[in-house]
């Protein structure tokens, strides 16, 4: 199953994450199928390729809870309860 999740990179105590599509059985920092965006929790900076994310979601990719929250904040996907 393909999941949209975060892949950590950056220095110690200064994490940055790439939003990637990868197999759910892969390691957190393993090989990604496709890079879809960027998230920095320290500066709260987010860059997202909306077209690629929507394409992956239409193909049946699942999101992790954190990525879903990031996409909700960016108003890319609607909240389920709304």
UniProtKB/Swiss-Prot annotation:
Xref: InterPro entries: Ribosomal_bS16, Ribosomal_bS16_CS, Ribosomal_bS16_dom_sf
GO terms classed as biological process: mitochondrial translation
Keyword tags: Chloroplast, Plastid, Ribonucleoprotein, Ribosomal protein
Domain of life: Eukaryota
GO cellular component, one term: small ribosomal subunit
Protein's cellular compartments: Plastid, Chloroplast
Keyword match Transport: no
Pfam families given in the database record: Ribosomal_S16
GO-annotated molecular function: structural constituent of ribosome
Family: Belongs to the bacterial ribosomal protein bS16 family.
PANTHER family to which the protein is assigned, alphabetical: 30S RIBOSOMAL PROTEIN S16 (PTHR12919), SMALL RIBOSOMAL SUBUNIT PROTEIN BS16M (PTHR12919:SF20)
UniProt-recorded name of the protein: Small ribosomal subunit protein bS16c
Source organism of the structure: Porphyra purpurea (Red seaweed)
């Amino acid at each position: 199953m393909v999941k949209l999740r975060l892949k950590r990179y950056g220095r110690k105590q200064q994490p940055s994450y790439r939003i990637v599509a990868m197999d759910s059985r892969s390691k957190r920092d393993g090989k990604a199928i496709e890079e879809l965006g960027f998230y920095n929790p320290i500066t709260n900076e987010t860059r997202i390729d909306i077209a690629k994310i929507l394409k992956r979601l239409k193909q049946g990719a699942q999101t992790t809870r954190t990525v879903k929250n990031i996409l909700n904040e960016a108003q890319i996907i609607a909240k389920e309860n709304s």
